[in-house]
Each structure stands twice: as structure tokens, then as C-alpha cells.
A protein has these predicted regions:
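Extended recognition/assembly regions associated with phosphoester-bond processing machinery
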Residues: 1-81, 85-285
Length: 285
């Protein structure tokens, strides 16, 4: 996905072709690889009640798709970068076994599984298998890469990482409509090469420097979760914080899931982020 940034890069960020998943490949041969996905949104659109086979966006279908990517890449770990479930307030009783079952199926592939809490993940922790590693909204660092959801300020440790990976934005790109696809909407990756100088809004807000030279925003894993057509519309207020503050002072480009470079993106002014304490983990590492 484009040329790498200058300087030493200990971990390769490799988008999985034709899939909304990012593979972290450390240079060290003994280091495990991690597959990063975001915005799974289990329970979206009434998919719990629909009859028949697993519908698009259902937990079973999403688990099948994620397991297929795990087997295809041979990864040793899976990290969900926020919004594992869709309901924002709590976890409805009907959704609780679905959440547990989804993560249990991924764990059954003998991979380490983690979740960085997103704004939709309030109340999810008691309904996860105990083997799932849970990280707060401030994010975590894997092999030098800072990973967070994007709705709240990352921790200072994450901010100091050389590269950042986030979700939350549901990035998309609108192509010319066709008879087969009248809307022309596509999920996409956003990749930014930033200037090394830290962004001023971060210095004022957190007294911390954003040292990342490369930022990657992953597309929503759930295909029915909707997209922000970044080449046509300004992101919704709840998502523009990430797009404005963290992607500023750099060059942003969009790539379709098949790797097609569809060009540069405008970066609008950001809105205020949520507090980092808005979503907290009951346990984590």
C-alpha cells in the first residue's frame, strides 16, 4: 500500500489483499504476527433475528470471514481495534451469547485474541471469554505500532509510537456509479505519511508529541456498518476528530481493498475528541 516511510521500520504493515484486515509482521523471526481488524459491530441491523442462513453482517458470517483470513495469513494473533459490538449502551441479553461465541470461535483457531475498547464496547467485557486480552480506549503498542480505536485520546505511550493504526472512521471512497452498483461506495484504507514535527493541537491538549510518521486507518470489518465517503463528504462529527487532528500535517491517500490507489484525500478541521476515560477496561494488559 504505497511506498514505506523513510528510516528504520521494525514491523511491516501489510493490508491483506481483498480483505479489511491488516497484518503486523515484525522483522524478528521469533516474534508473533498480529492481524488487526476494527468495527465488527456484532448485532448490527437486527441480524440476530433474521431467519435462514447466516446473513451478511451476522456474527456467524463475520466469524467465518475472520477465521478464513486467520488461516490464509497464518497469523498468531488477532486484535480487534474497537467496536466489537454495535449497541452503544450496554449489551442486550440476546447479544451476550453472540459476543461470547464470536470470540470463542476465533480463540478456537489457537490464536491470541485481544480487544481495544471502542465507543460501542461499553459493558462488553463481562461477556467475553476470559482468554481475551482487553485494552482500554487509550490503546496498546504491538511491536512498535500504536493501536487504538479513534474515538478518544490515545495514551502517551501509543502517541510516541513510530506508526499508528486506528479504526472508528469507517473510511470509504465513492466511485462513479454503474448499473450494477448505483451507489459506487467502496470500503477503503487511509494511509498518511506525516511530517516528523508533532501536531500543535496535540501539544496543547495533552502536552504530548505525536511522533508517528505513518498512520493507517483500517476499513470497517462489517460490510453493512456503513462508510464515510471521504472523497465526497466531511466525516460525521463523531468521527472527524481522528480524521482532522491525527491525519493533519501529512499527505493522506485512499486505497481500495484490492490495493488500488484511488488518490489523495482532503483533511478537514477536527472536532473535539471524547475523554480517554469514556470507555474503560475491567481487565487488560
Amino acid at each position: 500500500m504505497g511506498r514505506p516511510v523513510a528510516g528504520p521500520v521494525p514491523t511491516r504493515l501489510a493490508p491483506v489483499p481483498d480483505a479489511p484486515a491488516l497484518l503486523l509482521e515484525p522483522d524478528r523471526r521469533d516474534a508473533p504476527r498480529t492481524l488487526v481488524v476494527a468495527d465488527v459491530h456484532l448485532g448490527l441491523g437486527g441480524t440476530l433475528e433474521r431467519p435462514g442462513g447466516p446473513p451478511e453482517g451476522s456474527a456467524d458470517r463475520l466469524a467465518d470471514q475472520l477465521i478464513a483470513i486467520v488461516k490464509r495469513t497464518g497469523t498468531e494473533g488477532v486484535l480487534v481495534a474497537g467496536d466489537a459490538k454495535h449497541p452503544i449502551v450496554g449489551t442486550p441479553p440476546a447479544l451476550r451469547p453472540v459476543v461470547f461465541g464470536f470470540f470463542a470461535r476465533i480463540l478456537s483457531e489457537d490464536v491470541r485474541v485481544g480487544l481495544v475498547l471502542g465507543n460501542h464496547d461499553v459493558g462488553i467485557v463481562p461477556h467475553l471469554p476470559r482468554e481475551v486480552d482487553v485494552y482500554p480506549a487509550g490503546g496498546t503498542v504491538r511491536d512498535g505500532v500504536g493501536i487504538f480505536h479513534g474515538h478518544a485520546w490515545p495514551s502517551n505511550r501509543v502517541l510516541r509510537a513510530d506508526r499508528l493504526v486506528a479504526g472508528h472512521l469507517h473510511p470509504g471512497f465513492r466511485l462513479a456509479p454503474t448499473a450494477a452498483d448505483p451507489e459506487g461506495k467502496r470500503r477503503c484504507w487511509v494511509r498518511v505519511e506525516r511530517e516528523p514535527e508533532p501536531a500543535r493541537p496535540l501539544r496543547r491538549r495533552r502536552h504530548a508529541e505525536l511522533g508517528a510518521r505513518e498512520i493507517v486507518v483500517v476499513p470497517a470489518f462489517n460490510p453493512i456498518a456503513g462508510t464515510e465517503s471521504l472523497n465526497r463528504n466531511r466525516p460525521a462529527r463523531g468521527r472527524s476528530f481522528l480524521y482532522g487532528r491525527f491525519l493533519s500535517r501529512g499527505v493522506a491517500r485512499a486505497y481500495l481493498l484490492d490495493g488500488t490507489d484511488v488518490g489523495p484525500l482532503p483533511i478537514p478541521k477536527a472536532s473535539a475528541p471524547a475523554s480517554r476515560g469514556a470507555t474503560r477496561a475491567r481487565r487488560g494488559r
